[in-house]
């Protein structure tokens, strides 16, 4: 028996050697964890809309970028994991454009049924099409490596690939919302300031504490022909009319107080299922998630089974698991945006973005409050936000964008909404590109290059308040028809009742620029009309609807750019097919010497004529 056992051991050993030789991995010749080192000009932590816009804008301006996102999808609060609606400045003429508009138009083109999972991929596509971006999904920042006062690298862990990353960079952008790069020692705040610290009259007596606005788990409903009762899990709350039976506080001046709990199905995304403001929205995140689940199931059970039949034709289609956050950490920058900045319209020399949502200050007690859930103060139509809100006052190579910018609690109550944070992300990413270009710091960009930053943002279709874009020199030196002169006013949208555009009939009309002498033209910049005024960009609150959305009908679909050479002939120098974007920045294959340039529209997405806001020769 001993010889048999010895023979078996020998055979097993030989088999193992053969298996390893053939490529089988075992504990002897493989790893459980992996280590990888990466390096880029700009490292962006956080892949919500602010982080996406920051990464893409920096990449398009020539930087190598690493985007680190701890979730499997991009989009943050707007993603399919959370499904919060994107809102921003009030009024059609104030609609946020730039990269956010590009993403939303891509969604219209490739997601006509407005499904949330496909919306995720509209955001994803915007990132992965940029060759300068390395995207790390499912990757959480765990620590920072410092070099004196500066951040030298991030340490991160990828849960899918079991990989430890050391990510080196020259500039670091925190778009996480929760401010993980505070590990650098950057100054920050959590909670509500006293009213007298910044003279914020709307704070009242509710300041000087660590309370914040809460988190929310959302619901999505589906219309149905049949009515079936709903039973919530045993661990959920079970509400009755008494839980919703209290007086709505009346309006007051200067704020309007609302309860907002609306247990009815119409036009409802259930943002008011909110909790966590009285505790810590970071440290207590798991407890908050469970409490919100208990509330969400209880709310739906109450609504669905209500004797008045308010939800008899609805079923619960989706309930969130990941809460959306409104507030946690606010970094401290050279400027702290306050209530007074917002209400005085934010006339800053270093303006780089704008807001326009109300000062929407949620009660930390949130859903469990029997009083008001929010106090909204009407703000100016739009207000400027300065560059000094986007970089650290004490860590020289740290910038930030999103809900962790430098602001008071009251200031953040307006700037935290996602259309605004997308603009802030684009501004931060563009500013980061200038930091890399000049080998300097955000503070020095603020001091020496703010005008260049503002021009770049406007050129990228990010409107800035209290100023208009400067058309190109070539455009201004050309002659054109009186009707086309509006294209060189720098106002790339309808504004205060003025159209600011021209109508072009496909196959019949064109926009023509002429020069007295031949000029060298290397490209063109065009702003088509994406119909801010006629549509909503928000995802649907009801799931499984079959109504399709379309690319805006007056958008130019197919077009040509033609140049007239010295021979007097029109030559096509660029042809665009299937266009669905508002901003087109076009580089010709090679510069052309011409004494005329024209934009020819071949087709639209359904309208009889295309509407164009700008056509610049470059």
Which stretches of residues belong to each language-model region?
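Bacterial Sec-dependent N-terminal signal peptides
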Residues: 1-17
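Predominantly extracellular/luminal regions of secreted and cell-surface proteins
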Residues: 469-493
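Conserved N-terminal/central alpha/beta ligand/cofactor-binding core
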Residues: 21, 31, 39, 57, ...
């Amino acid at each position: 028996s001993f010889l048999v056992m010895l023979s078996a051991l020998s055979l097993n050993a030989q088999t193992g050697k053969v298996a390893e030789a053939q490529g089988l991995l075992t504990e002897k010749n493989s790893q459980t964890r992996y280590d990888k080192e990466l390096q880029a000009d700009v490292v962006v932590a956080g892949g919500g809309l602010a982080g996406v816009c920051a990464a893409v804008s920096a990449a398009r301006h020539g930087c190598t970028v690493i985007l680190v996102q701890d979730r499997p999808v991009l989009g943050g609060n707007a993603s399919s994991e959370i499904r919060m609606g994107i809102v921003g400045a009030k009024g059609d003429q104030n609609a946020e454009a730039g990269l956010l508009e590009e993403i939303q138009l891509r969604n219209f083109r490739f997601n006509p049924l407005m499904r949330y999972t496909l919306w995720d991929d509209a955001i994803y596509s915007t990132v992965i099409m940029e060759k300068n971006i390395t995207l790390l999904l499912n990757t959480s920042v765990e620590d920072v490596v410092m070099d004196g006062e500066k951040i030298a690298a991030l340490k991160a862990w990828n849960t899918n690939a079991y990989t430890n990353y050391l990510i080196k960079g020259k500039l670091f952008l925190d778009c996480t919302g929760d401010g993980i790069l505070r590990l650098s020692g950057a100054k920050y705040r959590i909670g509500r300031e006293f009213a007298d610290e910044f003279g914020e009259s709307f704070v009242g007596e509710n300041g000087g504490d660590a309370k914040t606005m809460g988190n929310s788990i959302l619901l999505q409903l589906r219309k149905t022909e049949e009515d079936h009762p709903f039973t919530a899990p045993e661990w959920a709350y079970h509400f009755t009319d008494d839980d919703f039976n209290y007086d709505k506080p009346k309006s007051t001046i200067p704020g309007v107080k609302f309860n907002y709990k609306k247990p009815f199905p119409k036009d409802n995304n259930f943002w008011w299922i909110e909790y966590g403001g009285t505790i810590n929205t970071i440290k207590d995140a798991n407890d908050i998630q469970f409490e919100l689940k208990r509330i969400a199931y209880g709310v739906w059970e109450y609504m669905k089974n209500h004797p008045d039949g308010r939800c008899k034709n609805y079923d619960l289609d989706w309930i969130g698991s990941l809460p959306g956050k409104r507030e946690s950490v606010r970094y401290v920058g050279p400027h702290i945006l306050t209530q007074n900045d917002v209400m005085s319209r934010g006339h800053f020399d270093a303006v780089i973005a704008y807001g326009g949502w109300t000062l929407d200050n949620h009660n930390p007690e949130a859903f469990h409050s029997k009083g008001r859930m929010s106090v909204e103060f009407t703000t100016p139509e739009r207000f400027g936000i300065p560059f000094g809100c986007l970089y650290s006052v004490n860590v020289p190579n740290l910038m930030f964008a999103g809900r962790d910018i430098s602001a008071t609690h009251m200031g953040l109550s307006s700037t935290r909404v996602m259309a605004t944070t997308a603009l802030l992300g684009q501004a931060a990413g563009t500013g980061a590109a200038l930091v890399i270009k000049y080998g300097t710091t955000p503070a020095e960009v603020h001091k020496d290059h703010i005008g260049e930053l503002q021009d770049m943002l406007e050129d990228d279709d990010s409107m800035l308040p209290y100023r208009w874009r400067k058309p190109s020199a070539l455009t201004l030196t050309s002659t054109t028809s009186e009707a086309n002169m509006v294209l060189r006013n720098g106002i790339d949208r309808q504004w205060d009742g003025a159209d600011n555009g021209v109508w072009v009939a496909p196959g019949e009309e064109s926009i023509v620029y002429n020069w007295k002498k031949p000029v060298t033209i290397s490209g063109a910049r065009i702003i088509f009309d994406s119909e801010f005024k006629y549509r909503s960009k928000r995802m649907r609150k009801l799931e499984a609807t079959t109504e399709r959305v379309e690319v805006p009908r007056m958008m130019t679909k197919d077009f040509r750019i033609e140049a007239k050479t010295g021979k007097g002939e029109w030559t096509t120098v660029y042809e665009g097919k299937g266009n669905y974007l508002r901003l087109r920045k076009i580089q010709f294959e090679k510069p052309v010497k011409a004494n005329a340039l024209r934009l020819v529209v071949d087709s639209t997405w359904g309208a009889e004529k295309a509407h164009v806001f700008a056509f610049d020769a470059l």
